[in-house]
């Protein structure tokens, strides 16, 4: 049993799985994995399948897909082709777009019993580490790629992560394997290719053990990051509100470094891209510490950081719904715009709304400007703007809260109050938020 195959088998023996899925690009690393997998399947009876992702970026993409299918047929392995389209005009790097698209189409193939195999090797790890270093990353970025990690409903494994490209190519030549060569790999305009051709050879010639050193550093960074996240998880429980906001008072208790890490953990909790160090400072200085009478907001990518009642909130940019209106037919669900869910006026004994004589005059709006109401239990009408403030509705939600109207009069504001003139027991207004089946 040769060294690489032994290493491969030992890697897989460490983890539980019932099925193996190989991400097959057709390059030398994935072709070596294919050969190792076929050998392991014959020896151990593994259930193995391959998936090739067709990015459509190269004029040779169709040929690569056919080549991967042919190679799999030769070893008796099923191979599925997944096609993706990349928005190359988005401004994002093609490398990032392609990587995200690959993971997106691979995910449905990975259930709880599946182990996804990826072909990244020690030279890829070195490049990833250097790219993170170039960006000024902390422990999370410098941890680079994990050898084993959760993915979709199962896990992924990079069994060649400690093996050099030179060793992989030597194995491929020794076993007379063939592979495709992506012509874009020679284009040093791409950062990773620049490192591969211009930087890594110099580093490895000067320090032959640098791959192993980088791998150790990456593992140490991953360990430090895991410990940090364990600590932050407890701190975040204290800082985060039931509505998902972040307490400014709790942030103020900690050091600058602690505050910065809590803000980043808050973003991670909401599954949003990490803010940079500069952005965390702006969140604190421009939003959290803004004057009491201000309504501060900071836009970061496709999200806004807002402040309300001594807490920070992450909200999507406000959409103008002032011109939207629609009739509301009792017992029928009304779809609301911008993913705000559905409304339904439901007959219910013991409800809180009196049904008007002519229900065809009922309609829904999001525009509170100029409207007044008197909630049940109060005396005298007030502007909706004032009522929103009294009910503690954040400014960004005030024009995203449905208002039920009858002709030109406010019947109720969803989830807040019913006007006293419309108090009754005929029906109730139910707001199904975010397309949930259960009203919130």
Curated annotation (Swiss-Prot):
InterPro entries in UniProt: Lysidine-tRNA-synth_C, Rossmann-like_a/b/a_fold, TilS/TtcA_N, tRNA_Ile_lys_synt, tRNA_Ile_lys_synt_N, tRNA_Ile_lys_synt_subst-bd
GO annotation terms (biological process): tRNA modification
Keyword Secreted: no
EC number(s) per entry: 6.3.4.19
Compartmental location: Cytoplasm
CDD domains: TilS_N (cd01992)
GO molecular function annotations of the record: ATP binding; tRNA(Ile)-lysidine synthase activity
Superkingdom of source: Bacteria
Catalysed reactions, as listed in the record: cytidine(34) in tRNA(Ile2) + L-lysine + ATP = lysidine(34) in tRNA(Ile2) + AMP + diphosphate + H(+)
Binding positions (ATP): 25-30
Primary location class: cytoplasm
Class of this enzyme: ligase
UniProt keywords, alphabetically: ATP-binding, Cytoplasm, Ligase, Nucleotide-binding, tRNA processing
GO cellular component: cytoplasm
Protein family (similarity comment): Belongs to the tRNA(Ile)-lysidine synthase family.
Entry's free-text remark on domains: The N-terminal region contains the highly conserved SGGXDS motif, predicted to be a P-loop motif involved in ATP binding.
Family matches, as NCBIfam families: lysidine_TilS_C, lysidine_TilS_N
Function, as annotated: Ligates lysine onto the cytidine present at position 34 of the AUA codon-specific tRNA(Ile) that contains the anticodon CAU, in an ATP-dependent manner. Cytidine is converted to lysidine, thus changing the amino acid specificity of the tRNA from methionine to isoleucine.
Protein name, UniProt field: tRNA(Ile)-lysidine synthase
Source organism (scientific name): Vibrio cholerae serotype O1 (strain ATCC 39315 / El Tor Inaba N16961)
């Amino acid at each position: 049993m040769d060294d690489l195959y032994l290493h491969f088998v030992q890697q897989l023996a460490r983890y539980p799985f019932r099925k193996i899925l190989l991400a097959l690009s057709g390059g030398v690393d994935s072709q070596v994995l294919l050969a190792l997998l076929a050998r392991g399947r014959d020896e151990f009876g593994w259930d193995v399948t391959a998936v090739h992702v067709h990015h459509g970026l190269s004029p040779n993409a169709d040929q690569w897909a056919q080549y991967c299918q042919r190679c799999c047929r030769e070893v008796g392995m099923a191979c599925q082709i997944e096609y993706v389209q990349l928005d190359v005009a988005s401004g994002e790097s093609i490398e990032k777009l392609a990587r995200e698209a690959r993971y997106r189409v691979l995910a449905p193939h990975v259930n709880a019993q599946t182990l996804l195999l990826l072909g990244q090797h020690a030279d890829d790890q070195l490049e990833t580490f250097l790219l993170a270093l170039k960006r000024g990353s902390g422990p999370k970025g410098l941890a680079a790629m994990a050898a084993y990690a959760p993915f979709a409903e199962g896990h992924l494994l990079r069994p060649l992560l400690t093996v050099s490209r030179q060793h992989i190519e030597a194995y491929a030549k020794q076993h007379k394997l063939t592979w495709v060569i992506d012509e874009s790999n020679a284009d040093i305009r791409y950062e990773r290719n620049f490192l591969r051709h211009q930087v890594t050879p110099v580093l490895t010639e000067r320090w032959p053990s640098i791959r192993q050193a980088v791998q150790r550093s990456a593992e140490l960074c991953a360990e430090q990051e895991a410990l940090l996240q364990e600590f932050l998880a407890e701190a975040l429980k204290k800082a985060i509100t039931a509505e998902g906001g972040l307490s400014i008072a709790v942030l103020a208790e900690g050091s600058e470094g602690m505050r910065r890490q809590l803000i980043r953990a808050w973003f991670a909790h909401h599954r949003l891209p990490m803010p940079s160090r500069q952005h965390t400072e702006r969140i604190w200085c421009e939003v959290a510490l803004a004057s009491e009478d201000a309504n501060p907001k900071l836009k970061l990518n496709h999200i806004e950081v807002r402040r309300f009642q001594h807490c920070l909130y992450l909200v999507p940019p406000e959409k103008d719904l002032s011109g939207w209106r629609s009739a509301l037919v009792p017992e029928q669900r009304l779809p609301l715009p911008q993913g705000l869910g559905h409304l339904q006026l439901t007959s219910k004994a013991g409800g809180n709304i009196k049904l008007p004589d002519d229900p065809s005059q009922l309609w829904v709006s999001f525009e509170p400007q100029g409207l007044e109401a008197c909630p049940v239990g109060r005396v005298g009408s007030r502007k909706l703007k004032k009522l929103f403030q009294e009910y503690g509705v954040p400014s960004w939600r005030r024009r995203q809260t449905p208002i039920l109207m009858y002709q030109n009069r406010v019947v109720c504001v969803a989830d807040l109050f019913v006007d006293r003139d419309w108090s009754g027991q005929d029906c109730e207004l139910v707001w199904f938020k975010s397309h949930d089946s259960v009203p919130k």
